[in-house]
Amino acid sequence: MTISDREWVARHLQLLTAEIPSDVVAVTGRLVADTIAIAGYARAHGIGGAAFDAASVQFSGQGSSVWGEEAKAAPLDAAFLNGTAAEALDFQEVLINGRNNGHAAVVIVPAVLALAGQLSSSAEAVTRALWVALAANIGLGEALGRAHRANGLGFRTTSLTAAPAAALGCATLINNSLDTALAALGICASTLPAGLLSAMSPKMGSYSPDKDLSVGFSARHALHSALLAGAGATGPEAPITGDKGWLASYGAGSADTSYLETPPSERDLTAYSIKLYPANFGCQAAIRASIELGRQFAPDEVTRLHLEVKSSSAASLSTRSIENHLAARFSLPFAAASAFVRQRSVLADFEGKAVADPAVHAFIDKIELTGSDELEAAHLSRGIFPARVTAYAGENVLARVSYDGPFDGYSAAQDEAVFAEKLASLCGAERAEVLLAYSREPLSDARLRTLV
């Protein structure tokens, strides 16, 4: 028998009194720091949707923090602005899950922290709200599957799963009522601003900022749903599994309610991975491999650079028409060519005139992109985003480099070091130290106060 929506929510509320595992503390701290740094950079530089999302927003000295701005805004506006900016660089985390992968922190962190700023919530309450939301997002994603974005459909996983999960997390900051939490989930899931993937389609080629705005709307919607529930508004009793509900509407044949049975306390939050490079996650392993090969061979020594990635990434990240920064971030040919030619992959490589660099575009012609069913199967079974990159001189193999992801083989110390470097590149050394301090001590009220 399928678990009821009420019981599913009740199980998540048990996290409010459970001992917080060390990995939950570490993951939530890192995701908050990462999200804030990315959003702050995008806002300060007016990138993507952050260039104009403040239209009709009134800033003031009160309210919730807008990352990258001195002023504050009303909580709903702050959630929208921070969600939009957090998405703009495509530098955000990804849930590594073979059943369904997508972004979540870009919705959950802006919504939860905007409310925490309004309510002066404790650091422990915020950490628990994030735990609830991130665990719920995994459950919703697994139950949904990925047919919602296949066979011509284009619903974004982030819009469908992260918003209801964030609403559930926000509800726990308002009170610990099961009725409030279920209502927040139900209102959010039943009234979703369901973002579409059209902007990122190589066939469409628009690469437009509605991608960013969609995340902002989701963060705002999640918080708004929780506030309405806190005020007494109600939603369906079975918004997720019920007739004409969320799964029935978006499942598209891949829905499986058995995935909702996993206890939230058993959800592995370490499946959320930050990005090492400012491009789509499907590009990450190929970028790392291309950098290494670029340090071994000059561009004129290589006649062909063969990229093998999972077949779905080869299709969705295939564009060679690089009209703007977003197209560059969603192009395996550009990302790999840039990494090889420049022997790096940093923010500046995807901005301004760098997007039109003749040396990079000349090397794009040497990129051969192949989708591998073998690598797709590895992704589906293990959740990884592998890549094999081979440099050729004529028909002779010069070298081949393979990785399962951007952090493949890194030690804990290396992982921490590159994360610190990422934060510094986004917000400068001083702000990076503040964010790093929070990421290491997210249960500290004093650390939280520096952010909200």
Where are each of the predicted segments found?
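Accessory "access/gating" subregions that flank catalytic or transport cores
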Residues: 69, 221-332
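N-terminal core-entry segment
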Residues: 1-270, 441-452
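Residue-level preference for alpha-helix termini and adjacent loops
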Residues: 139, 154, 212, 239, ...
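Generic alpha-helical structural element
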Residues: 21, 170, 211, 275-279, ...
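Intrinsically disordered, low-complexity Ser/Thr/Pro/Gly-rich interaction regions
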Residues: 280-441
